[in-house]
Amino acid sequence: MKFISWNVNGLRACVGKDFESQFKALDADFFCLQETKMQEGQLDLKFEGYESYWNYAEKKGYSGTAIYTRHQPLSVSYGMGVEEHDHEGRVITLEYDNFYLVTCYTPNSQTELKRLDYRMTWEDDFRKFLKDLDAKKAVVVCGDLNVAHQEIDIKNPKTNRRNAGFTDEERDKMTELLNDGFTDTFRYLHPEEVTYSWWSYRFKAREKNAGWRIDYFLVSDRLREQITEAKIHTDIMGSDHCPVEVDLAL
């Protein structure tokens, strides 16, 4: 099964930049989107053979997630069941016979780390949410997790040390999650590869490949042997992020 995840940084804008042909070319079983930045009814985007599920932020033009799937789920849930976190459209979970698929758009800690304290609360609650799912069946979790985990995952680690997305606190929370039974699929297959998934729109960052790897597929450790491929599609444009992929023998 082929899974794709892409922070589209505004789906309506991305549709104007060839999204539909990219979607069809990637030909995924599951296509997860983050930062859709839209409300219900603003875009009617259907693909033959796919059902879609949407979680919208209450605030207009902000956050939001979606999943297109070729496989009818047993159940669908939105958010993580924590009132504090469930107003921004950040999480969707699809349940299948032998796994859960979770897509997530993790809150950014923002300039001057204004939202870092909230981010720490989110991290603990999201980790508990995933562990509770994992106790029932295996989990595939994807999305913009808004952290470059190790120095290999960011072009300029020294100058970004206290910037949102590369603080010790955020990196430690990712380590905690992985230590609690999850595997970073790309790093598992490609331990030394330097590839990024996000580039600032400023300073010609993408042209210079001054990027960050902040988009992930994580799987329950017991799915490790079923990871057949993990890719980052750096050639696909349309957003400041590019799509990431995992193929699993499920």
Predicted region positions:
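N-terminal, active-site-proximal structural segment of metallo-dependent hydrolase catalytic domains
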Residues: 1-47, 51, 57, 62-63, ...
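Active-site-proximal beta-strand elements of phosphoester/diester hydrolases
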Residues: 1-9, 98-110, 142
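Active-site beta-strand/loop signature of hydrolases that rely on acidic residues for catalysis
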Residues: 7, 23-41, 101, 130-151, ...
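Conserved beta strand-loop-helix elements of the APE1-like EEP
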Residues: 60-75, 193, 205-225
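Metal-dependent phosphoesterases centered on the DNase I-like endonuclease/exonuclease/phosphatase
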Residues: 51, 125-210, 214
